[in-house]
């Protein structure tokens, strides 16, 4: 668990996710079979206003941690709107003119053809997604980027669950770092969510359930 104090941007993002109904509390059965006391459904950032605001959080995080030139790659399908909206936010808010591209899951054999849509994949490439679980989509994105002769530089996600993928195994983020060699940035992390809830009177009653979940499945050293 991170020992750093929650930042203003993390606090603002978590409030935004909760107020938007994207981050909810209760009992949710995950694909893994675990019963989680919270659920983050980024698919509910489904209006222009919500997507634009989400993109500003991605852009602010990237502007702070990626001083060098880079381009964005959005894995199909969830990464597509994230890449486009974040590139726009980087230009509008940070004067960073970042190319973006995404892949088709089905290769097109007419028109412009091919698998890649958008800018030519070149240079340092940051992969953008909402969350990671198994890391399969990230691995496929790395293959596409390397096949184009470019450098997979980092992955950015909205929320790092900081949760082991199997008993005593690494978290999805740790696995991507160790197995795929990618730096991983996140707008917010599970440990910061607990801190945010602890400091928010009308939500502090959720803390004990999240702490119990962290104690059972969390990556305390991440």
Predicted regions and their residues:
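PRPP-associated nucleotide enzymes
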Residues: 1-128, 133-222
